[in-house]
Amino acid sequence: SDFLIEVDITPNRADACSHYGVARDLYAWLVQNGYETSLHRPSCDSFAVDNEDFPFEVEVVATEGCPRYCALSLTGCEVKESPEWLQDKLRVIGLRPINNIVDITNYVMMAYGQPLHCFDADMVAGKKVVVKTLPEGTPFVTLDGVEHKLSDKDLAICNAEEAMCIAGVFGGKGSGTYETTVNVLLESAYFN
């Protein structure tokens, strides 16, 4: 069995908007009150960085709306159903499992408080990501198949030809991660 803790977060405690953030607070309270415990961080020692085979160019035009944008390309991925343990972890916090790639980004977001988004890297025209606004009324179809008209204030994540995502809000149908996806572009950004 497991425990479910509901936490009300005040605006000054964004650091507690994740499982790890809440765990740090609980750890601090336990230590301060004389309990012996430890907090373990996952090891990243086996993660190898090599972007020579699948490079992407990133350009942030709208720097006020996006002070920081990072992307990581992953090749040879197999998109499939997530393991049952991951699906269960997502369901218990009110998220719907989609596939292993999308699910792990949602899991990391809830665990560490860093929103992530993944694109089918082969659908990123020109191997270029541009963070910018688009003209008023630009049509955009979201992952759920609904067409929206963008405002000239909406921040968009674009490839060399078109919008792929409304920044921090909703991904686009044309660049989503599906069963046919083999290469993934993983986004981690800070949007105002």
Report each predicted region and the residues it spans:
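RNA/tRNA-interacting regions in translation and RNA-turnover enzymes
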Residues: 1-192
